[in-house]
Design a protein with these regions (language model features):
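Acidic, glycine-rich A-domain
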Residues: 1-133
Length: 133
């Protein structure tokens, strides 16, 4: 999910029947980061899907702070109660900002967070995160 002209957009990165691979990671890296994503709203829309599918891992990419951190933290707790491991990748313009974003995401309740400042590094970071679980 991301926002385009204040609309929440959904992107299909990996079909359900396909294993995660480099092609999926590259598709993920092509989603434009433009900030302003109402993460709690996105998670609320995902809630029925995640409840029914109960994936092992739910990966969030973020380029900043959620608009409602308390609601996001509550949703993360809810997803974790389903047995879903919540992981986040903070994307920043440089190493320092990426690290700050990743640290802030950790405070929301994500079990694992990483920072990345170069878009070309996203596929490897995603594969590293998913491979370590």
């Amino acid at each position: 999910f991301n926002t385009t002209e204040r609309q929440v957009m959904c992107w299909l990165i990996k079909p359900e029947d396909l294993k995660w691979n480099n092609s999926c990671a590259k598709r993920l890296a092509q989603i434009p980061a433009n900030g302003g994503t109402p993460l709690a709203e996105v998670y609320d829309k995902m809630h029925p899907i995640l409840y029914s599918k109960k994936p092992d891992i739910f990966l969030t990419l973020s380029d900043g702070e959620p608009s409602d951190p308390y609601a996001v933290s509550s949703m993360i707790k809810s997803f974790k109660s389903f047995g879903i491991k919540m992981v986040a990748l903070g994307v920043g313009r440089d190493t320092l900002s990426a690290t700050i974003i990743a640290t802030n995401l950790r405070h929301l309740g994500f079990e694992r967070t990483l920072g990345v400042s170069r878009l070309k590094d996203i596929p490897k970071k995603v594969l590293d995160v998913l491979g370590s679980n």
